[in-house]
A protein has these predicted regions:
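Intrinsic low-complexity, intrinsically disordered or marginally ordered coil/linker segments
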Residues: 108-111, 117-121, 125-126, 135, ...
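Short, extreme N-terminal leader segments that mark the start of a protein/domain
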Residues: 1-42
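A mid-sequence, solvent-exposed acidic-amphipathic segment
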Residues: 122-169
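A glycine-rich, hydrophobic loop/mini-helix early in the fold
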Residues: 50-119
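Hydrophobic/aromatic-rich, well-ordered segments within soluble, folded domains that form packed cores
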Residues: 159-189
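Short, flexible/disordered intra-domain loops and linkers
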Residues: 39-53
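Short, flexible, solvent-exposed loop/turn segments with mixed acidic/basic and small polar residues
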Residues: 18-23, 74-79, 125-127, 152-156
Length: 234
């Protein structure tokens, strides 16, 4: 699947996948924008890949011009043959969430310094890349995995997916911890994330995410810009 690289198509994908973050009820969202953004088996050409990346980055930059004054930023984490992995987040809200010891301690054990958000995102992108196919590339030039236990990694291996990504999406701390400890098994409810504790609150949150997405999709279709969507939900 390849998606057209233009402002309307991209913004529609953002609204569909990131409305809770636009509305301020979730610190971050992650989605894949379909298309070929990394070379696999020599196809397509490097020039074609670079051209597609440049076009998408230009679209994202234009959206950031509108959203950054409103406290929202978006960036590509990883380029893959199946699509670009795009992270949309509220830096202030995310830093507040990550400053909790339940996140800080767990992330420090995986090589993150959450006091430095840009560096943490570089590290996250590197770890996702290591866990992906050989064709995947971090969107951060020269980024490497900082974990001592991953020093054995080479171009022919695939490392375990960094499930600590749940912290970077603002999921409940204990649910992220239990997901990692229990390897994604034995959960009570599966919605926006796998729930291990406080099912009732999680179900309420799932409902709010759905309602938010429906509402923002509706007013976006009436002609609102992304910035207007953010302001409408303040």
């Amino acid at each position: 699947v390849t998606r057209t690289i233009d402002i309307p198509t991209y913004q529609t994908a953002v609204v569909r996948n990131c409305s809770p973050t636009l509305a301020g009820i979730k610190p971050a969202s992650l989605f894949t924008y379909p298309g070929v953004y990394a070379n696999q088996n020599g196809k397509p050409s490097a020039a074609h890949i670079e051209e597609r990346r440049s076009r998408l980055l230009a679209v994202i930059a234009q959206c950031n011009c509108e959203l950054q004054p409103l406290g929202i930023h978006m960036s590509v984490l990883v380029w893959r043959p199946c699509g670009a992995l795009i992270y949309v987040y509220r830096p202030a809200d995310l830093m507040r969430y990550l400053s909790d010891p339940r996140a800080t301690t767990a992330l420090a054990a995986e090589g993150y310094d959450v006091r430095n958000l840009p560096a943490s995102l570089v590290h996250l992108a590197a770890r996702i890349t290591l866990a992906s196919s050989n064709a995947a590339e971090s969107a951060y030039d020269g980024s490497v995995c900082a974990l001592a236990r991953n020093r054995h990694c080479d171009t022919g291996c695939m490392c375990e997916f960094p499930h600590e990504i749940g912290y970077f999406l603002g999921y409940p701390y204990e649910d992220v911890h239990q997901f990692i400890v229990q390897h994604g098994e034995n959960y009570k409810v599966f919605g926006a994330w796998k729930v291990y504790t406080n099912v009732e609150q999680a179900l309420t949150t799932f409902d709010s995410y759905r309602a938010c997405t429906q509402y923002l999709t509706y007013i976006y279709q009436q002609g609102c810009t992304l910035g207007q969507l953010v302001q409408a939900t303040r």
